Amino acid sequence: MEVFSFGSYYPGDSAIHRLDPRTKLLLGFVFLITTLTVSSFCGLASVAIFIVLIYTVSRVPARLVLSSMAPLLAIVAVVAVLNLFSDQSGRILWQLGFLQISEGSLRSAAFMACRLSLMMAGMSAITLTTPTLDLTAGFERLLAPFARVGLPAHELGMIMGIALRFMPQFATEMKQTADAQASRGARVTGGPLGGVRMLGSVAIPLFTGVFRHAETLSAAMDARCYHGEQGRTRLHALTFGRGDALAAVVTALLLACVIVINLQLV
């Protein structure tokens, strides 16, 4: 059974699924910038409402959203822990030598964890509602104007597409390898230490499989006489529609809302 991870696509025919991939990529960039400018929990609440609206319209099950974000939550945990010792304002709650945790550091850690989680949820919405080939085509079309100055737009799009395609397969093979190790009698213990030990036992067969898939992919591309963008055509042309304009308006409203909230706190 395939493991649902970041980069997986959930088939559907919602208004979000039908958006042009260029619109999703551009608005995704605006969303990231908007989320980075948020300076309060009220602003994060408006971003959270925006994300809930997206997933409600796209009709992607919540369990798949959480499953796609699960591999990235370790990054959130690391960022939160680092922020525990960054802001030392307010009353000190715990201290050990030069390390101390205060009310301000707890607030900062919670804020950064929420912000990063919302950013991941927003970007997961793009990969969950857009096939990899469409994302690759959209990314390539956005970079096409820079091809005149020597930027390899097609090659960069191909790299992004291959990376996104291999993420779910990488997660699936990691689970299969871990299950195979457990079925052969490998001890699986809970907690962070057990996870590190299990990761060490699956690392070699996992990366061996990754290199094998890479070699198979290169052989398949050579067999199909792939020589880059030259001479390639596309079956479906990318076109903007009314839905793309509406999505841009909604994203602009989110940006305006965040700006207003930030100005009120100044």
Locations of regions flagged by a protein language model:
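A diffuse structural propensity rather than consistent per-protein peaks
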Residues: P61, I101-S102, G241
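Juxtamembrane/interface alpha-helical elements of multi-pass membrane proteins
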Residues: M69-G185, T189-P192
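Alpha-helical transmembrane segments and their membrane-interface exit regions
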Residues: F50-V60, A74-V78
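Membrane-interface helix-boundary motifs at transmembrane edges
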Residues: V60-L66
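Transmembrane alpha-helix interface motif
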Residues: M1-F41, V47-T56, R141-L151, E155-M158, ...
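Hydrophobic alpha-helical transmembrane segments
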Residues: L25-L26, L44-S46, L66-M69, L73, ...
